[in-house]
């Protein structure tokens, strides 16, 4: 059974995992990596910071430093992001004529959501503790542990997508190592002088 934990704080650094429904390789199938970066851009526009990430073929790990959300729950922000990315991924799947995949995603929508107009279940609806759904990062040591975990993902186990962490395109590993990468992030050490409790 999946478990959802409500977050009652409105700022801080969080480790977030978002998983595609039934672990389908939807980012890869749709070439939807850009949809994640669009969401990251949206978060930045609201004053939040992307501190580390990896986009795997079927899931995302990301460290997000939330600046004071002014009463908007972090759960809601993550939920909005999932909806935003879902629309983009479904659009891309339609463009690629992935009829079978779309049918499988449609079959996963429960009756209640279907009545509300939902047509595809792109992401797992809840956060599973064993997947480390989200945990608040309270120290640099903990953040480092999570960054190491994030950056090692493409080299780990059955994935074996690259030999070296910095070789994986859709990750902040290269940015931490060289200061360059496909997407600009804010290193966690740069956050030390930023008061996340203050709104933008």
Where are these regions (language model features)?
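Short catalytic/metal-binding and nucleic-acid-binding patches
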Residues: 1-200
């Amino acid at each position: 059974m999946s478990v959802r934990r409500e977050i009652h704080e409105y700022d801080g650094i969080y480790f977030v995992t978002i998983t595609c429904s039934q672990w389908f390789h939807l980012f890869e199938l749709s070439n939807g990596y850009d949809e994640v970066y669009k969401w990251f851009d949206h978060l930045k526009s609201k004053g939040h910071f992307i501190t580390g990430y990896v986009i795997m073929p079927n899931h995302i790990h990301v460290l997000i430093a939330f600046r004071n959300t002014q009463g908007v729950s972090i759960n809601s922000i993550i939920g909005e992001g999932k909806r935003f990315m879902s629309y983009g991924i479904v659009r891309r799947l339609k463009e690629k004529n992935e009829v079978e995949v779309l049918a499988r995603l449609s079959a996963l929508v429960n009756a209640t959501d279907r009545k509300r107009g939902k047509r595809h279940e792109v992401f797992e609806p809840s956060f599973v503790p064993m997947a480390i759904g989200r945990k608040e990062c309270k120290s640099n040591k903990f953040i480092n542990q999570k960054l190491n975990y994030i950056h090692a993902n493409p080299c780990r186990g059955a994935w074996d997508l690259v030999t070296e962490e910095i070789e994986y395109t859709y990750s902040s590993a290269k940015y931490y190592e060289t200061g360059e990468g496909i997407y600009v992030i804010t290193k966690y050490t740069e956050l030390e002088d930023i008061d996340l409790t203050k709104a933008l």
